[in-house]
Structure formats: structure tokens, C-alpha cells
Amino acid sequence: MKTKPVMAATAAFPDPAHAPLDIELPPVLGRAVIPLALTIDNLRAIESNVTSAWQFSPRSGWYKIYLLKKRRLLYLVPRRSDFRLSLILGRKAVAELRQGPFARQTERLLKTAKHYPEGIAFVFDRKTLDPDLLGAFLAAKLAT
């Protein structure tokens, strides 16, 4: 018998019947919205055709995905006064990053990143997010 998933206590938007609007995000994130906004601005500067969509998860509530056509670029899980931002990079993108200006940071993050068949998952929050670093990660992802 499967157990029902438990909603995270920090979920910013836990109500499955109410999909959040984008204007509801900044008040929930508080000061955490600043590095996130810089990151999204960097993404849109790299690729102007990026779209976003809200989806619901029984564990984390409503989360937002950023897409280029059907390709998932970023996952944003809003939390109260925080967020979890994740992306998956393939081998070619990681190889490109290891040769670039963020090689040292990439190597450090690779030590704790989760490895999956489709690529390597990098996860950031309010404290660990560097918008310039994530901009380089997104540029590498889009280039491959």
C-alpha cells in the first residue's frame, strides 16, 4: 500500500485548487526574490523566447518551470522567504563549464550534485544562488 505524499511545511503555495499568479511570488519570497529576479533576467537576456508555467506537486505544492519550447530549463520551487531552483545539465554542458571562467565553482558543485541518466542536477537556494554562475550554467545548457 502506497503512502500519501506529505506536503513540505515550507511550501509557499500548498493549495492544489489555487494556482498562484506571478504577482503573488515576490511577497512570499521576501528578500529572496532579488537574486531570483536577477537570475530570471539573465535567462531572458540569453534567450528571449523563454516561457514559464505553474505545476502542482503533492510534496512541494505549486512550482514553476521555465521552458524553451518544450525543453525544461529551470525548476523553481517557492518556499516561504526562500526557494529551491534546480536545473539538469548534460555532459557537454558540464564539459564546457569546466573549461570556462566558472570552472572552480563548477568543480565544487559537482562534488555534491546528484547524477542521473539524463544529466547532473544542480540545486540552489537563496543562500547558494549566484546569478552570474547560474547564468553561465544556463548559457552552457542552451548551447548544447
What function would you assign to each model-found segment?
Residues M1-R44, N49-T51, S57-P58:
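Charge-rich, low-complexity N-terminal segments
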Residues A8-A9, D41-A45, Y75-L87, F122:
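Charged, low-complexity, helix/coiled-coil-prone segments
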Residues F13, F56, F83, F102, ...:
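Phenylalanine-focused residue identity feature
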Residues P20, E24, L38, P101, ...:
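Exposed alpha-helical structural elements
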Residues E47-S48, K64, R84, R126:
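Functionally constrained cores in energy, signaling, and assembly domains
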Residues S52, I65, I120:
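Residue-level signal for functionally critical sites in structured catalytic/ligand-binding pockets
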Residues F56-Y116:
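Short, conserved beta-strand/beta-arch hydrophobic-aromatic motifs that form part
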Residues E107-T144:
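Well-ordered alpha/beta subsegment
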